[in-house]
Every structure is written in C-alpha cells, then in structure tokens.
C-alpha cells in the first residue's frame, strides 16, 4: 500500500511538471521547482519531528506516531503540494486575463472622436 501511494503521488507530480505550461521558478539547488522543495522540507521536518521525539529510530515510534507520519507524508503533503500549485497557477491565469491597456489613438492609427 505504501508503494502504491508513492507511485500515485510521483505520477501526479510528474504529470504536473510535464503538462503545465507555466513553470514554478526553479530553485538553484538541484534544479527542483520550489513546490518540490516545499514537499521535501515538509516531509523532512515531519520525519525529524517524529523521529527526534522517539530517540531517532522508526522502530521506537509508537503506533500512533507511525500512523501520524504516514498520514502526514502521504495525504497532507500532497494536498499542500496541489494547493500550493493551484495558488501559483491561479495567479498566473489572473495575470493572463488582465486586459492590456493600449492607447486607442496610437493603436488604430487615428483618434476616435465624438461628433455632436
């Protein structure tokens, strides 16, 4: 089940990189998009938080902590990832929809006047 969640998550993330035309600015470290770094930071901080509270070993974690770790890494992190991507892409779409202001006189080649 664990491998299935990872496979689905990585397929969705790969599809996200391939099919979206607007890319998140690439970070300097490793060429990862910022959203992937965001996921890595969330996952690493979750792992660090849960493993440090139990002495640094997965086997020493209680069943509740193991369940919490699985929920955080496989459900909440992808949700944060897609929300993060949605916010960035919606901002890009808003910028595309904004009308570009032009001077009608210069654009049409003559000034539009109102005759009374």
From Swiss-Prot:
It is a multi-pass membrane protein. The chain crosses the membrane at residues 24-44, 70-90. It is found in: Membrane. It comes from the Eukaryota. Keywords: Membrane, Transmembrane, Transmembrane helix. GO terms for cellular component: membrane. Partially overlaps REG2. This is Putative uncharacterized protein YBR051W. It comes from Saccharomyces cerevisiae (strain ATCC 204508 / S288c). The lineage of its organism: Eukaryota, Fungi, Dikarya, Ascomycota, Saccharomycotina.
